[in-house]
Amino acid sequence: MLVKDFITKEIPVLKSFDTAEYALALMEDFKLKHLPLLSDSAYQCLVSEKDLLALPDPSATIGEPVLFAPAISENRHLHEALAMITRYGLSLLPVVSVDGTYLGAITRD
C-alpha cells in the first residue's frame, strides 16, 4: 500500500498572500490543525493553528514561513506516513512528488 493510493485533493492549501484569519477559518471548516503552504505548486511548509493563533495580527498575511515542513513521497509505504502523522501529532501529511510538487495530502481518517 503506497501513499499515492490514499492521497486526497480535498484539503485546501495556503499561499503566502493568505491571511492568518483566512487560514484559521479553513482549519475550522475542515476540522484540521494544519494546512500546507505552497509556492506555485511546490510545497513549502506546514502551517499550524498554534502558530497562527500566536501571530499578533490575524489580518496580516502569512508570508513565507518555513517553520516545519514534514512531507512524504508518493511512493513511500502507507505505514511510514502513519508513523510520521503519529510521531509529529499531525492532522494531515502533505504528499509530494520526487521534484517537490505538492500532490495532495493524507489524513488520519
Located regions from the model:
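Bateman (tandem CBS) regulatory domains
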Residues: 1-11, 58-69
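Nucleotide phosphate-binding site architecture
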Residues: 4, 12, 21, 53-54
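Histidine- and aromatic-rich ligand-binding microenvironments
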Residues: 19, 51-52, 64-65
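Short beta->alpha transition motifs characteristic of CBS
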Residues: 8, 32, 36, 42-58, ...
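The conserved cystathionine-beta-synthase
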Residues: 13-31, 38, 71-91, 95-98
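Short beta-to-alpha loop/turn elements within the nucleotide-binding domains of ABC transporters
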Residues: 1, 18, 47, 60, ...
